[in-house]
């Protein structure tokens, strides 16, 4: 997580992210974030905006199984992602998500199920 949050993210976003009307998040509370998914940068920006330095918790992302392949998969795993099969969600993936919440962690779910560009109808996907 150090390389992702402290080096890669700061390189791309060091002077571009401004958090307005910041709020305090209790250290012992669970957090579920369900943002819209407009680009591949969403997870990185969210990590900067709501990650350990802000919420005292690492972001744990639920992503689709195909996203966890290759170099992208390695990067996502190191960012704190775990996969779920949208067509046939396994109990172990769901249990992992529940365990994160029970432990007071921060879970990020993109309810659209994929990147959805501006102007397109937002449709929630099954799989959770």
Give each language-model segment a name:
Residues 14-128:
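Soluble catalytic domains of membrane acyltransferases
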Residues 1-14:
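N-terminal membrane-anchoring alpha-helices
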């Amino acid at each position: 997580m150090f390389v992702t949050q402290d080096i890669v993210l700061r390189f791309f976003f060091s002077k571009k992210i401004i958090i307005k009307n910041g709020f305090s998040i209790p250290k012992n509370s669970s957090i579920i974030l369900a943002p819209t998914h407009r680009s591949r940068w969403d997870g990185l920006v969210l990590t900067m905006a709501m990650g350990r330095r802000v919420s005292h918790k690492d972001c744990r992302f639920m992503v689709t199984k195909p996203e966890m392949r290759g170099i992208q998969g390695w990067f996502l795993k190191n960012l704190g992602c775990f996969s779920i099969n949208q067509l046939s969600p396994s109990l172990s993936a769901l249990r992992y998500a529940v365990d994160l919440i029970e432990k007071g962690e921060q879970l990020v779910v993109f309810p659209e199920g994929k990147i959805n560009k501006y102007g397109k109808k937002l449709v929630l996907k099954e799989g959770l």
